[in-house]
Amino acid sequence: MEYINSKVSGANAVVSKGDAGDSSIIISPQHLKEVCRQLKDGEHEFQVLQVIMGTDFLAENLIEVSYILASFTKNSELILKLRLPRGDENNLPKVDSVVEIWKAADFQERECYDMIGVEFLGHPDLQRILCPYDWQGFPLRKDYVTPEKYLDMVINPISKMNIEDREFGAKHAHIKGASTSVDNYKVDPPATVSETETV
């Protein structure tokens, strides 16, 4: 934290200790690129961007973007976070892209845009990556409402499986633990040690 604040004026880095898991460092969004450059090129050598993810804090009207960085030379890991106003479909939260710092950010920023609606300024090709290009809304936002249909295809969020998945499950019901009923199809239980020893 002190390192970031000493290298980037206005970064306002503070340590955040969660209820569980690792602590993180929260910074001012407008200084993201400067901070990331220092973390990658400076003495801590965070050469690897492992994950970019977004979290919707609906009650607080915030979107939190997290960057998990790793330094293999220093054997260390860092969780960097920033918080953005939640906005809406016509006024998405915005933050600079870090693709020019870590190429691995390319698809991860696209996924974060697609799923939670964060606009990464300066991204070379910011478009949906999991949903169809004309999909409406952002599926991981807590107030997202799944449409009943897409291009005349029925979407069934209750079962989480389409009919082809159910039929496949019924056809392969001879597998230990699977149900023979299409309506009650369930995932196979994990194998025990004794079952895998003879394979």
Language-model features, listed with the residues they occupy:
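Terminal low-complexity/charged segments
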Residues: M1-V199
